[in-house]
Amino acid sequence: PSFVATAAASIRKLGIPKRKVLTVHAIGGQPHVEGNDDLWILLADALKVQTLEVLVVGPDVRDRPARAYRGRVRVTHDAGAYDVANRRVWRAAPDVVIAFHAGFWGYDSWRPTLMGLLRTSIPTIVTSYTMEEARLDVRALGAATLEEGASDDACDAAAAALDLLWGPEENERAGARRVVASAPPGHDYRENNVSFCFRGRPDRGRPG
């Protein structure tokens, strides 16, 4: 599946040093994707990690205590928005955060989450259905560093100053095409079609 392949390739690209436990937080999770624990079992196999600790967070996810698989994969589900300041369900700080098809640009509710992540040095991998949506997601990150209501030009300028580990780029591991009735002519929607990765700066006011 493109979700496993994309996550594995992106985590390898980050060059995270090997460790006993790799901790991944998946934000904006959907029950049929991130909420399907098989995804994380397959990711652990793909990365060949000793232990994979996963926290799946999203308003569409139901609270569920950790479940263990094969003695090396633990997955916890937490309903609600992701807040780096609320660590009640964390077993450890994440090595990486993943946001599949998050659509930062389309939902004001993402703003507090983005503001929090931008105050940490945690790398966050983001995927989108199209290049245009990815660029809008980057703009939303820029907007999260400014006062609400900032102009698009100001948001783009702020986004240009962000620490992008890689900017929006086509993903070789993109998945199936999606038919979207409202899509503009010529727009090709595919699962995980585009990815980028950012990290914030702890000196923004909160430790990473």
Write out the residue ranges for each language-model feature.
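C-terminal functional extensions of proteins
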Residues: L118-G208
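Non-core capping and flanking segments associated with repeat-based/extracellular domains
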Residues: W110-M115
